[in-house]
A protein has these predicted regions:
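Basic helix-turn-helix/winged-helix DNA-binding cores
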Residues: 1-65
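Short, charged amphipathic alpha-helical surface segments
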Residues: 51, 56, 61-114
Length: 117
């Protein structure tokens, strides 16, 4: 399977597929005559897993550890859930603060600076 076909099948851009190869997340074979990448079922399976983990905002280093069997999947998912909860709390605080600024009806940047410093 070509990189174009792999991209269509997985929903991952060709650029990202090449990057994942460079990072050592996938290992496509190469055609002898033209050095084109060839993706097999295992490459596609790994790409789909990478796609799923990236949707969870998981770092590539952690994904690699999971795919290589160096990190337990359930443990990684629990850690990621905690990371997402922390991000959610920070975003909620930022949204709340944004609303507070709007409610004060401050229109001048100097006023905002004095009011919240």
């Amino acid at each position: 399977m070509t990189i174009k076909e792999a991209a269509l099948l997985t929903g991952i851009t060709r650029q990202n597929i090449r990057y994942y190869e460079k990072m050592g997340l996938i290992y496509p074979s190469r055609e002898k005559e033209n050095q084109y990448r060839k993706y097999n079922k295992e490459d596609i399976r790994r790409l789909k897993l990478i796609y799923m983990f990236r949707k969870l905002d998981m770092p590539l280093e952690e994904i690699q550890q999971i795919l290589d069997g160096r990190k337990d999947l359930q443990e990684a998912l629990e850690q990621q859930k905690e990371q997402l909860r922390q991000k959610q709390q920070k975003l909620a605080a930022a949204l709340s603060f944004c609303g507070e600024i709007q409610e004060t009806e401050l229109t001048d940047l100097n006023e905002i600076g004095r009011a919240h410093v």
